[in-house]
Amino acid sequence: MCRNIKTLFNFEPPASDDEIKSASLQFVRKLSGFHTPSKANEEIFSQSVDDVAIIARKLIDSLVTNAEPHNREIEAQRARLRAQQRFG
């Protein structure tokens, strides 16, 4: 799994459209192998990012859980601690 794609479901506040778009861009980059597409692939690359973002939003909005929403600040602190432990 691409480490740059973060879990977006069940957070308070909910995932923004920008966060979903960023995750969609990372996903399409991973699948295509392109960080920046050539002119020949630019249109389909961009359309694919938009399509993935639409489906991702539908998924996130449709999922249900009984779990309490995660707090973004607490999760960010945990991520920083893991990074510090991992990289020193």
Question: At which residue positions do the language-model features occur?
Answer:
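A charge-rich, low-complexity, intrinsically flexible signal that marks solvent-exposed coils, linkers
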Residues: 1-88
